[in-house]
From Swiss-Prot:
Listed InterPro entries: CutC-like (IPR005627), CutC-like_dom_sf (IPR036822)
Entry keyword set: Cytoplasm
GO molecular function, one term: copper ion binding
Disulfide bonds: none
Protein name in the entry: PF03932 family protein CutC
Gene this protein is translated from: cutC
Sequence similarity: Belongs to the CutC family.
Localization of this protein: Cytoplasm
Predominant subcellular localization, coarse grouping: cytoplasm
A Pfam family: CutC
One Gene Ontology cellular component: cytoplasm
Length: 251
């Protein structure tokens, strides 16, 4: 039986968050913009900056907030963003696309996977809106995704833990089920005790000081939903995962 490394992926949407995640011990970065809206594709400059930290970085490929039903023109933008991630020297992309009924858009995802050939790829939480998650799991496997980021179709991974455990059982090692959404140091042990986990996703974010009376806020430039990566929370989460791994997690 070989040991399985426990990978902590931290999603960030600004340079300060990127640096906090690195200092806190993240193993991989999910690079986004506008996490308050669920995360969209970051700028080329942010991609280039992220490439200098020496960690694997996966870029969110999502041209806008809202649903995951994308037009032909939006798909073209997504391909160009994949090109930008590759040009920046980043290791992976985070993809997802739905049909009108919530099922995975197999044609578009296959096209995007082909366009990202040679890069690591994560299927994001578009998976969570699928009406049949077991069917979506098999679809993700057939598309060749190494992992799925999922909350088990719930608002948080902890709320969806039973579904996550079932998905992990059905996956049978064919694809990684990476829990995400609301993962905090205070709640992660309940996930770890529920099913075998080798990768976990978190933002470890906290709401920064926000003055609604400031001139910047009154002019509409500062959003109350903006959050900041908490380096201490990243470090605490990493410590818990490392202790769990040393406790005998094997494959």
């Amino acid at each position: 039986m070989k040991e399985v490394p426990m990978i902590l992926e931290i999603c960030v949407d600004d340079v300060a968050g990127l640096e906090a995640a690195v200092r806190g011990g993240a193993d991989r970065i999910e690079l986004c913009a506008a996490l308050s809206g669920g995360g969209v594709t970051p700028s080329a400059g942010f991609m280039q900056r992220a490439a200098t930290y020496g960690l694997p970085v996966s870029v969110m490929i999502r041209p806008r907030a809202g649903d995951f039903v994308f037009t032909h023109d939006e798909a073209d933008v997504m391909k160009r963003d994949i090109d930008a991630a590759r040009a920046a020297g980043l290791s992976g992309v985070v993809l997802g696309a739905s049909r009108g009924d919530g099922s995975l858009d197999m044609a578009l995802l296959e096209d995007l996977r082909r366009h990202a050939d040679g890069m690591d790829a994560t299927l994001h939480r578009a998976f969570d809106v699928a009406p049949d998650m077991e069917e979506a799991l098999e679809a993700a496997i057939s598309l060749g995704f190494p992992r799925i980021l999922t909350s088990g179709g719930a608002r948080s991974a902890l709320e969806g833990v039973k579904t996550l455990a079932r998905l992990s059982e059905l996956a049978k090692g064919r694809i990684v089920i990476m829990p995400g959404a609301g993962v905090r140091p205070q709640s992660v042990q309940a996930l770890l005790d529920s099913f075998p986990i080798t990768e976990i996703h978190a933002s470890c974010s906290a709401v920064p000081l926000y003055d609604p009376e400031s001139r910047v806020a009154k002019l509409g430039f500062t959003g109350a939903g903006r959050k900041a990566t908490d380096e201490a929370a990243v470090r605490e989460l990493k410590t818990i995962l490392s202790a769990h791994h040393k406790g005998g997690a094997t494959l």
